[in-house]
Amino acid sequence: MGMRPAARMPKLTRRSRTLIMVALGVIVLLLAGPRLVDAYVEWLWFGELGYRSVFSTVLVTRVVVFLVAGLVVGGIVFAGLAVAYRTRPVFVPSHDNDPVARYRAMALSRLRLIGVGIPAAIGLLAGIIAQSYWVRIQLFLHGDNFGIRDPQFGKDLGFYAFELPFYRLVLSYVFVAVFLAFVVNLLAHYIFGGIRLSGRTGALSRLARLQLVSLVGVLVLLKAVAYWLDRYELLSRTRSSKPFTGAGYTDINAVQPAKLILIAIALICAAAVFSAITLRDFRIPAIGLVLLMLSSLIVGTGWPLIVEQLIAKPDAVRKESEYIRRSITATRHAYGLTEDVVTYRNYIGDAPAIAQQIATDHATTSNIRLLDPTIVSPAFTQFQRGKNFYYFPDQLSIDRYLDKKGNLRDYVVAARELNPDRLIDNQRDWINRHTVYTHGNGFIASPANTVRGIANDPNQNGGYPQFLVNVVGNGTVVSEGPARLDQPRVYFGPVISNTSADYAIVGKNGDDREYDYETNTDTKRYTYAGSGGVPIGSWLSRSVFAAKFAERNFLFSSVIGSNSKILFNRDPAQRVEAVAPWLTTDSSVYPAIVNKRLVWIIDGYTTLDNYPYSERTSLSSATADSTEVAFNRLAPDKRVAYIRNSVKATVDAYDGAVTLYQQDEYDPVLKVWMKVFPGTVRPKGDITPELAEHLRYPEDLFKVQRMLLAKYHVNDPGTFFNTSDFWDVPLDPNPTASSYQPPYYIVAKNILKNDRSASYQLTSAMNRFKQDFLAAYISASSDPETYGKITVLTIPGNVNGPKLANNAITTDPAVSQDLGVIGRDNQNRIRWGNLLTLPVAQGGLLYVEPVYASPGVSDAASSYPRLIRVAMMYNDKIGYGPTVGDALTGLFGPGAASAATGIEPTEAVPPKSPAGSSTPPIAVVPSAPDGSVALSAAKAAALQEIQAVIGAAREAQKKGDFVAYGSALQRLDDAITKFNSTK
């Protein structure tokens, strides 16, 4: 029986077609409209910053990749479908109950929809996915040589960094396209009768056989190409059974030859498949395909497994030594840990020291950091916020400046930003929120090595940071900070941008509108005069931003005039990531005064995920420490095999200008991106001396490097394989922490030069593998003349690590008893600050841990911690007292504290101590009531007891006997209670 004529679809009326077109138009508008608005807004934003070439380059690349990938994949699928249709049999036998006939009729009635729609949908999806790989495309197009060749194939590393990922991407897309073409070709032949399954054997037309066999043959050839590329990817392979990255003995001597054998087998199988075109016999290609699958199991998997178990493992150290050496060399180069960067030096770690030796380490002892930037933010907020809408981040930053005497000091710094979420009541009105409260005001710096006065008890004044302020006030810029600042207004910053509606409307439109500061009698207003901002004076711009932010006030508010501009995307790191989308930014952004301007400094990294023999590292895992976990500031979950701090970026806090500087002049990855986006990165020579003085070694890179140094400091392959000399990053000993101890920025004596000059450095202790004893001390220099140089002090013996030191300090009887008295009855909350490890004297290590106390036991914002004690440990001895000098004297004797920093006077001076005493009074003694009324005998006796206990406490304090001192404080508390209750 012949094929039935196709059933006709009912025609739509004109009105129905119109409604359908309108509905489709609305859907397209809803889907594409927001994206078009976003694209136009980004075009304006990039233009305002001077980086429109970045926007256009990325956009053009994405569009071209989308079109090419979509047309290639869609075209191949369309070809598979079209050829099957055009070569369909003229006559197809059928019967009444043939289910295929119904599908055939349906396909013929919707031929254009199916024939064009399916390939178009597949091509569209392929293009959307492919355009996200624009980075890989640009690296391939502009890639260059590294100047280093891999040890196995002798290819330049640029092949693995820039070419191999592109080849694998193209191969994947072609393979998927051909496979989909095979599937649609097979289905089309089945529907249109080229393949019939009726009867016991079925039937296959000659043209269907030709097409299907050809497509299968092409797939086999593509598999051969994949085997060829697999050989190069072996050099970046990881195995759980080996402690290093890259091709090992089994990979080189079994897997690689197996890949060559599989290539040959794949080519033979492809020939066998193509033979079916002429032989009309499917047994040969079937045998070939089965052979290929069995070979991949036997040759590709079985043989390497045998070699691994019988040859490599029994003699693993000797067999793998050459490849371990390759991995050590490659990993060190990929992560910037080569011999020209890292200097190793033996260090005793527990050498005895006397007071004179400690006193001569003035660069260290005068800069002992007392302020913990993760703890003192509430104090900044309490004393320097001023208004409810100003705010400081929960974690402050560390930078260095010269003090008035020209000494290098580290400072806890912060910009006083506007926090839109802190606005209340009418302040939240749209006009106030976006046109009045637009900016922060001020830069606050506190010397990290000192506090205002001594706080012997949380209820006494003292122990707070000393604030140096740059701020606009009384019509002028008050510049009391460590450097002069001409413009303290902050329009751009991480706090001000941390809101769902991050924009401010500024510009001259009548009277000054923006809140600036207050005097005793008036509120001063201000109008933004910077170059930043996108003009929104035209109705087109107002309409676009009304759609962008879903806010009708852009159209109807009179506060927007012809000179108005909008500031948005105000997060410094996000601005850098936008203009340099090829960078990975550091999680720490910090403010600095550079050339009298307030700027945010951001570190940018170039990374690769493929580098022969280099260990792959997860940035989120490597950079996670107790601080990152506590503040939920984890790095992106990105795996890298190569990283360089290639770019230093600044964002002006006033006008938002973004400037990128080349930091690493030898990074081949950066050179590629400088060719992709010419003119966007300034040469390293453009970094001014003022900016160089505030560049610091980046935290995230340092944390990645210290984790790798834990393994890759080992030179001997045998020792590396046995892991016997590995190190560990210590856990944070603070009982409230739950991750690794963070590295610390400090000013101390120069470890690199091994002299007593002051140096700004990023440091970390390292433990022995699975032990709590110290193995090493790592210091990375941030000084301009030695920037990036890393010094590793290797420590033998059983020197206490951070955990053991913290345990010894916190469990010391004098310390625990004293702090128990201070925190008695949960009246005060005790918090331990950062535990610093400081090399001092000739081969010694000093642990320093500040102690803070605040009223109550909660973490409430109203609880302002202040420094109340300083604890130290040297070897097995504990030093403890209200000041650095007290703790040093307790450890090393008189004279050790001669270089220690003094205490700045408080605004409200506490009662004076007895003459010659360097410690504050123990407590305020109750005085007799005024007037002629005499004390009762019992009350007089209680007062005498108080005075006697105070004398005992002072005597114990002078002697440094903190056990007796703590006992006296407890007796004093009891005596005061007795005095108050006595009639």
Curated annotation (Swiss-Prot):
The chain crosses the membrane at residues 20-37, 63-85, 113-135, 169-191, 212-229, 260-277, 284-306. Keywords: Cell membrane, Membrane, Transmembrane, Transmembrane helix. The keyword Isomerase does not apply. InterPro entries: UPF0182. The keyword Membrane applies. Pfam families: UPF0182. It comes from the Bacteria. Belongs to the UPF0182 family. This is UPF0182 protein ML0644.
